[in-house]
């Protein structure tokens, strides 16, 4: 069965990896490393949540994914604001799209837990 959240997280992680390779080629190592960690961690936590042991475990993993998503947004904003960093507006758009799906699922999960 297709899972739009999982699919979108893989798409975003792949785009993050490609963008980080561009950053590394431009010798922007520090932010590249930070972005690579947070941007790929989103999907890792979403994938882990798919096999959660309980509803609480699922919610916890999804909350971690949202934190990583927000960190990823932060690094992308810094790159966009900097005059010496290449920007990747498509990546920012995809991260925002992933966030909308993620927040909706998390919100629904929290409400259904009560």
PLM regions and their residue ranges:
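Short, C-terminally biased terminal segments at protein or domain edges
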Residues: 1-48, 52-114
């Amino acid at each position: 069965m297709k899972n739009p959240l999982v699919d979108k997280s893989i798409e975003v992680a792949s785009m993050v990896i490609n963008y980080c390779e561009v950053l590394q080629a431009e010798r922007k190592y520090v932010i590249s490393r930070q972005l690579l960690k947070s941007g790929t961690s989103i999907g890792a936590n979403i994938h882990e949540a798919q096999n959660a042991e309980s509803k609480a475990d699922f919610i916890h993993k999804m909350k971690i994914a949202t934190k990583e998503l927000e960190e990823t947004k932060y690094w992308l904003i810094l790159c966009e604001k900097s005059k010496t960093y290449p920007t990747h507006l498509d990546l920012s758009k995809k991260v925002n799209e992933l966030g909308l799906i993620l927040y909706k699922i998390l919100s629904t999960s929290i409400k259904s837990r009560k």
